[in-house]
Amino acid sequence: NYIFNNNMMSERPEVNKDIFWKQQLSNEVTGRFYAFRKKPINIIKKMEEIKKYCSNNNIKLIFISPPTHVDLQNKINQYNLNKEYILYKEYLKSTGILLDYDVANDITQNSENFNDPYHFSEGIARAIAKDVSVFF
């Protein structure tokens, strides 16, 4: 009953939210997402080019780490990727400005703020847009 696109399930479920939530956190979905993580050498090279271009042209480089529900954040530890995740965020901070919303807090602990563990609600999107707008 699910539509697969690039090996990921559609975020528009035909089942109730609780069932879909559990499916999104399953090894079938989240496990596949985290299972084959490796250092993205090509992406890092491109990022260095972008960083240099922005620096040479006085452009602010801003990254947004969008919020995910803590149920999904906890999967990083489950798949032993905490060290890599910290390095990833440190790299983004060293490259530009990082607005990091993917941290455990009152917002990310409340499932009402999310359509599923990966996707936040429209209200959260508006709050993030307001935060980001101060940079423009």
Regions found by a protein language model. Give the residues of each.
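Structured helix-beta-strand junction loops
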Residues: 6, 57, 94-95
